[in-house]
Each structure stands twice: as C-alpha cells, then as structure tokens.
Amino acid sequence: MGNKTFAIIKPDAVKAGNTGKIYDRIIQAGFHIMSAKLLKLTEEQAKGFYAVHEERPFFSDLIEFMTSGPCMVLALQKDNAVSSWRETIGATNPEDAEDHTIRKDFASNVQENAVHGSDSDENAEKEIAFFFADGELLSN
C-alpha cells in the first residue's frame, strides 16, 4: 500500500467556510500535508482531471460545480493513505456516510460532497502529479 493520496476540498466546502475544519480533520486523522494549494479550477483543468467521467451523464454538471469557486488541492502522506483517507471522508453520498466522517458532517448531496479522495495508489500518483511538481511535495 502506498503512503500518499490526493484530496480536494471542493468549492461547496470552501464556500461554506469549512476548509479549516476539514484541515483539522486531516491532521486529527494522522495525515502529513505534503503540499496544498488554494485555486479556482479552469474548465480545461476540471475536464482534464475528471476526463474518466467524460461519458457519464453528470459530467457537465460536475465540471460546472468544480469550476464554480475556489477549492483546495492537497497531497497527503500516511501509511495506507488511500484507504485511510477514504475511511476519513466517508461514502460518496453523504446520506450513506458513517457518522463523524467528513462527508456526513460537511456535505449536502452526492455531487456537492465536500471532498474528493483518490480511489487507488495508482490514481493518487496521477492526481498528485496533475496539480503538483515533484519539488512542491514535502515528505514527512
């Protein structure tokens, strides 16, 4: 298992003022923040990042949402980082998420679900590389 994962604090959570609270959850869960950037995704960036969903019916709504305001992209480090982060954030649909997970506490629906988390070590590496140069990552 890898020791890095990628996360996004999505525009809904940033707009609601929950960035700091989610940051606290990241630290409490034992993650080291290797790098973080606050940015507003361009349409081109969002389409590139979510290209895997291009044929899905929700793609245009997803792109519109992800470009609607600032978000925070993060490279996180911890043993078994991908599975640990996914456990910390909870199910994609906040209605199905366990109590005390980020999505249960901060998300409003399946699309505006506060955070993104990589689903595999391979995708974590790709997603980190999409937003961060090697020199921007600080190991613990």
Language-model-detected regions and their locations in the chain:
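Non-catalytic terminal and connector segments of soluble metabolic enzymes
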Residues: 1-140
